[in-house]
């Protein structure tokens, strides 16, 4: 299965994603500079905590980049529909193309996406069948990284021993309080927003319902049999191996194939 790169030309989305990258860079540069490395050098924390911080940061960035550039499940212009599966397809009244049921036409991107959940400006891309798992990983690692950074910011002032060796000639130490206050504000704001989003995403997967279906009061779930949560998560992540649900470096293998899209997934 080849990786399909997908770019959305949207200045609003670029600004939103740029803000996310700025927050990530702000924390990945300043938190270690002000908190982690000084306390490590004075023996207050073990080095493994710094490795964990950078590990979570890398996973978060990889999930962000891949969720942004991975094709969410754009439908081809002339799909081949097997005769036995035509009942599972419908005609889009906006682009006049045949699409599998539960697909949706994204007005911002201008095409239909398989099992589209929503269009997310923060990744400048749709969240659909092929990149939903990356979006979930992004939510998870963003929340984990935010909690980690807030925890160290709190411990820096209220738990760790005061630093004895600080070069006050450096900008970051002269303006430490302002920098840490801004980091705490961004962290709390990010944590509140991402927690609500992550919760709704998990509920949607457990109930096998997309955000668009919830907003449109779709009644398909009445006729659709309820699946075990392990099955719905396995379909989203493309594997039944739960440990792989947390790895953003791999390729997703589709488990949900009610229609023939092996070379489009």
From Swiss-Prot:
Localisation per UniProt entry: Golgi apparatus membrane; Golgi apparatus, cis-Golgi network membrane; Cell membrane
UniProt topological domain (Extracellular) ranges: 38-44, 155-185
The entry's keywords: Acyltransferase, Cell membrane, Golgi apparatus, Lipoprotein, Membrane, Palmitate, Transferase, Transmembrane, Transmembrane helix
Transmembrane feature ranges: 17-37, 45-65, 134-154, 186-206
Cellular component, GO annotation: endoplasmic reticulum; Golgi apparatus; Golgi membrane; plasma membrane
Annotated membrane topology: Multi-pass membrane protein
Entry annotation: catalytic residues: 120
GO-annotated biological processes: adrenergic receptor signaling pathway; hair follicle development; nitric oxide metabolic process; peptidyl-L-cysteine S-palmitoylation; protein palmitoylation; protein targeting to membrane; regulation of establishment of endothelial barrier; regulation of leukocyte adhesion to arterial endothelial cell
Molecular function in Gene Ontology: palmitoyltransferase activity; protein-cysteine S-palmitoyltransferase activity
Domain DHHC: 90-140
Tissue note: Widely expressed.
Cytoplasmic domain ranges by topology: 1-16, 66-133, 207-265
Known catalytic reactions: L-cysteinyl-[protein] + hexadecanoyl-CoA = S-hexadecanoyl-L-cysteinyl-[protein] + CoA
Domain of life: Eukaryota
Record keyword Cell membrane present: yes
Principal place of residence: Golgi
Family: Belongs to the DHHC palmitoyltransferase family.
Function: Palmitoyltransferase that catalyzes the addition of palmitate onto various protein substrates. Palmitoylates sex steroid hormone receptors, including ESR1, PGR and AR, thereby regulating their targeting to the plasma membrane. This affects rapid intracellular signaling by sex hormones via ERK and AKT kinases and the generation of cAMP, but does not affect that mediated by their nuclear receptor. Palmitoylates FYN, regulates its localization in hair follicles and plays a key role in epidermal homeostasis and hair follicle differentiation.
The protein, known as: Palmitoyltransferase ZDHHC21
Source organism per UniProt: Homo sapiens (Human)
Gene giving rise to this polypeptide: ZDHHC21
């Amino acid at each position: 299965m080849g990786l399909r790169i997908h770019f959305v030309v949207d200045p609003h989305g670029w600004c939103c994603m740029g803000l996310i990258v700025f927050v990530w860079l702000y924390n990945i540069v300043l938190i270690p500079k002000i908190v982690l490395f000084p306390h490590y050098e004075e023996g207050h924390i073990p080095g493994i905590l710094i490795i964990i911080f950078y590990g979570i940061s890398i996973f978060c960035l990889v999930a962000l980049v891949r969720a942004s550039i991975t094709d969410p499940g754009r439908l081809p212009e002339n799909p081949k529909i097997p005769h036995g599966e035509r009942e599972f397809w419908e005609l889009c009244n906006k682009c006049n193309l045949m699409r599998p049921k539960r697909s949706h036409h994204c007005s911002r991107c201008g095409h239909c996406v398989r099992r589209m959940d929503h269009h997310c400006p923060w990744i400048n891309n749709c969240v659909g069948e092929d990149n939903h798992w990356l979006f979930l990983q992004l939510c998870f690692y963003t929340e984990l990284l935010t909690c980690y950074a807030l925890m160290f910011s709190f411990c820096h002032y209220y738990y760790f021993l005061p630093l004895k060796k600080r070069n006050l000639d450096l900008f970051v130490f002269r303006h430490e309080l302002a920098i840490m206050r801004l980091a705490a504000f961004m962290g709390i704001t990010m944590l509140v927003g991402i927690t609500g989003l992550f919760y709704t995403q998990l509920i949607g997967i457990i109930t096998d319902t997309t955000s668009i279906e919830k907003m449109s009061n779709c009644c398909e779930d009445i006729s659709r049999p309820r699946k075990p949560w392990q099955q719905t998560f396995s379909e989203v992540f493309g594997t039944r191996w739960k440990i792989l649900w947390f790895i953003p470096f791999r390729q997703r293998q589709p488990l949900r194939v009610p229609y023939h899209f092996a070379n489009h997934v």
